[in-house]
Amino acid sequence: MSKVASLDAFLTKVAQRDGYQPEFLQAVREVFTSIWPFLEANPKYRSEALLERLVEPERAFQFRVAWTDDKGQVQVNRAFRVQFNSAIGPFKGGMRFHPSVNLSILKFLGFEQIFKNALTTLPMGGAKGGSDFDPKGKSDAEVMRFCQALMAELYRHVGADTDVPAGDIGVGGREVGYLAGYMKKLSNQSACVFTGRGLSFGGSLIRPEATGYGLIYFAQAMLAEKGDSFAGKVVSVSGSGNVAQYAIEKALSLGAKVVTCSDSSGYVYDPNGFTTEKLAALFDIKNTKRGRVKDYAEQFGLQYFEGKRPWEVQVDIALPCATQNELELSDAQRLIKNGVKLVAEGANMPTTIEATEALLAADVLFGPGKAANAGGVATSGLEMAQSSQRLYWTAEEVDAQLHRIMLDIHANCKKYGTIEGQENINYVVGANVAGFVKVADAMLAQGVY
């Protein structure tokens, strides 16, 4: 039985094979650096080439998507699907439409998805997919034609018991509808082949809210562990999409004052905080008008900071909900200097490794994305369960299940992240070890394949 000699040897081996994939290597380094002490104490997990198998996707494929724009011109985009690990259930993970999409980013997201899905305790493997197509500025007809062209190839590789995609950045309700509709036409099946669907064709209540709500439920549990709560806390949120919107909504309901939101162009600062009226306006600008946060700032006469991120604002709690690596070391240092108490990730790996290390060293409570933002995929799992039973659960039922799952994730993080001599729970270690153990045990039980 082969056994990995050391962490450095393992990371070097991965880098030699995938050295051109920095985002993926960052994710691998983050996970295995945090769980290595556990692996040294439990050598069975370093045998049977388990670690080498875990960092290699079961399959990954790239394909061309040719479609026609409104001017009759043929456009060509590149699309991918990374089916990373199915040890505990069908592949599950979103589809992202953004010009930055490449294999490295999707491998990093798919790798993270393995552990995130395992943490939910639901039977879902890890996957991720997407395209460098940018839906911004495209007509509905163009988006539909692109989605149908993409699904004409992807449908061969997905299915209710094989791989169930969902939305992600650039893939909202409109795109999911077009993708799921064409998948149904091609496969002649109405099973749950996509999650995040509209309520009129198999979707689940609370699914749009799930990631943002789940983030707040997890952060609330982190605070409760310290005898604290959101009441009266000043909160900074980055992003202004689905996750950010519903995180703001839930934080307001718990008595917090949320003072920022952002997009790729800059951020808005409101010292008085969001109100129900202001949040409704943000929903309208982003979801209906597909506008920018600058439009929101102008509507309410708020400060807008072009080209900047909201981490310079003095707050108690910071919730990065935009994109990967948006919170860098300098941002973390500024947050620490300003007295931040808690950082929880609503986006996938939005905090760099260096920033994470600085926050942990300063005893800031830190909730990693694979735990803190697992509410979205957890509710996708609940959508799959409802579809298989041909049932609709009420919003209260789904929300209660989501809340329970997030509390269970927190409990598992506490179980594996309580380290002798450390005052705070190390949620990075806890989340990574808890997710790893579930997947690793399943892989060992199923033999080498």
Swiss-Prot record:
<dbReference type="GO" id="GO:0005829">
    <property type="term" value="C:cytosol"/>
</dbReference>
<feature type="active site" description="Proton donor">
    <location>
        <position position="128"/>
    </location>
</feature>
<dbReference type="InterPro" id="IPR014362">
    <property type="entry name" value="Glu_DH"/>
</dbReference>
<feature type="binding site">
    <location>
        <position position="167"/>
    </location>
    <ligand>
        <name>substrate</name>
    </ligand>
</feature>
<keyword id="KW-0521">NADP</keyword>
<feature type="binding site">
    <location>
        <position position="380"/>
    </location>
    <ligand>
        <name>substrate</name>
    </ligand>
</feature>
<dbReference type="InterPro" id="IPR036291">
    <property type="entry name" value="NAD(P)-bd_dom_sf"/>
</dbReference>
<dbReference type="GO" id="GO:0004354">
    <property type="term" value="F:glutamate dehydrogenase (NADP+) activity"/>
</dbReference>
<comment type="subunit">
    <text>Homohexamer.</text>
</comment>
<dbReference type="GO" id="GO:0005737">
    <property type="term" value="C:cytoplasm"/>
</dbReference>
<feature type="binding site">
    <location>
        <position position="211"/>
    </location>
    <ligand>
        <name>NADP(+)</name>
    </ligand>
</feature>
<feature type="binding site">
    <location>
        <position position="242"/>
    </location>
    <ligand>
        <name>NADP(+)</name>
    </ligand>
</feature>
<dbReference type="InterPro" id="IPR033524">
    <property type="entry name" value="Glu/Leu/Phe/Val_DH_AS"/>
</dbReference>
<comment type="similarity">
    <text>Belongs to the Glu/Leu/Phe/Val dehydrogenases family.</text>
</comment>
<dbReference type="InterPro" id="IPR046346">
    <property type="entry name" value="Aminoacid_DH-like_N_sf"/>
</dbReference>
<feature type="site" description="Important for catalysis">
    <location>
        <position position="168"/>
    </location>
</feature>
<dbReference type="Pfam" id="PF02812">
    <property type="entry name" value="ELFV_dehydrog_N"/>
</dbReference>
<dbReference type="InterPro" id="IPR006096">
    <property type="entry name" value="Glu/Leu/Phe/Val/Trp_DH_C"/>
</dbReference>
<dbReference type="GO" id="GO:0006537">
    <property type="term" value="P:glutamate biosynthetic process"/>
</dbReference>
<dbReference type="InterPro" id="IPR006097">
    <property type="entry name" value="Glu/Leu/Phe/Val/Trp_DH_dimer"/>
</dbReference>
<dbReference type="InterPro" id="IPR006095">
    <property type="entry name" value="Glu/Leu/Phe/Val/Trp_DH"/>
</dbReference>
<keyword id="KW-0560">Oxidoreductase</keyword>
<feature type="binding site">
    <location>
        <position position="92"/>
    </location>
    <ligand>
        <name>substrate</name>
    </ligand>
</feature>
<feature type="binding site">
    <location>
        <position position="116"/>
    </location>
    <ligand>
        <name>substrate</name>
    </ligand>
</feature>
<dbReference type="InterPro" id="IPR033922">
    <property type="entry name" value="NAD_bind_Glu_DH"/>
</dbReference>
<dbReference type="Pfam" id="PF00208">
    <property type="entry name" value="ELFV_dehydrog"/>
</dbReference>
<protein>
    <recommendedName>
        <fullName>NADP-specific glutamate dehydrogenase</fullName>
        <ecNumber>1.4.1.4</ecNumber>
    </recommendedName>
</protein>
<comment type="function">
    <text>Catalyzes the reversible oxidative deamination of glutamate to alpha-ketoglutarate and ammonia.</text>
</comment>
<feature type="binding site">
    <location>
        <position position="113"/>
    </location>
    <ligand>
        <name>substrate</name>
    </ligand>
</feature>
<dbReference type="InterPro" id="IPR050724">
    <property type="entry name" value="Glu_Leu_Phe_Val_DH"/>
</dbReference>
